[in-house]
């Protein structure tokens, strides 16, 4: 077994132990006190720091980075939400708390300890599977978009694939993801 020690972490062949986890969490004070732009920048930075835990494969890391860039810079979450859910199905979502819960969801997916109970370990594995499925669907969507330039508007801006009869599987995936977001209070 190879053991690498640094000021910030201890790396083995199978695990990474972080000495200071404060760089990965948003404190309640930061959530409340930062302006919108500073909050988004701080959140984006923390999500990007989680990149090393997503996968060892470079392609998956790049897919995660592309997904984050889209989520933070381009996506109109409220438009997507209003097109997918009926008005009665929508609950009031606080932007800051939903971003914070999304970060906690991601941290839960990639953290594990000997002190965890079986339920906590199962929870962690479920979170990891959800993240992997999100990245897989996003990767395939990006491959379709890269083949044809007018597909970007179709999939990323207008969300017209929600209403036409094509791409039913992707529409159902997006609906289920939005319902999961509603239940957990996240913005995945």
Curated annotation (Swiss-Prot):
Keywords: Sporulation. GO terms for biological process: ascospore formation. Involved in sporulation and maintenance of the mitochondrial DNA. Is probably involved in a pathway contributing to genomic integrity. Belongs to the IRC19 family. This is Increased recombination centers protein 19. The gene is IRC19.
